[in-house]
Amino acid sequence: MKNEIHTILETSRTIAIVGASKNENKDSYKVMKYLQHKGYKIFPINHNFSDRKILGETVYDKIEDIQNDIDIVNVFRPSDEVIAIAKQAIEKKVKTLWLQLDIISPESKLIVESEGINFIENKCTKIEHEKFLR
């Protein structure tokens, strides 16, 4: 039986990585590389590297700068930055706001779910994806 996370990962194709890093030792880089290898179209977001490339993908300054539709916004930023990211996700009309391990934002959960956006927190997309490959 599929759960919500499995369904989200199975039906999504585009993922914006907020807090993307070009440092191969950072979790955001490792997760981004894994997801890209699994066939997802990745959109790295990091205002320090905008207009450069990470893993061959153009880096964007903000979610709104991406011209494509985004299925998942995957957040690698501190919890206190999530509300602003959630508001960008709502404006972009994304399907899911996903907060990585140790990132929690009850306020963001309330505002995105009130807009019909899926909300996942304190879970790693790579770890969750690997669970469904068994």
Predicted regions and their residues:
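Short N-terminal or domain-adjacent regulatory/targeting segments
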Residues: M1-T11
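NAD(P)-binding Rossmann-fold cofactor-contacting core
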Residues: N23-K26, M32-K53
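Mobile, glycine- and charge-enriched loop segments
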Residues: V31, L55, Y60-P78, E115, ...
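A short helix->loop->beta-strand "cap" motif at the edges of active sites that frequently abuts
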Residues: K38-Y40, K92-L97, E115-I117
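Rossmann-fold NAD(P)-binding glycine/threonine-rich loop
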Residues: L101-H129, L133
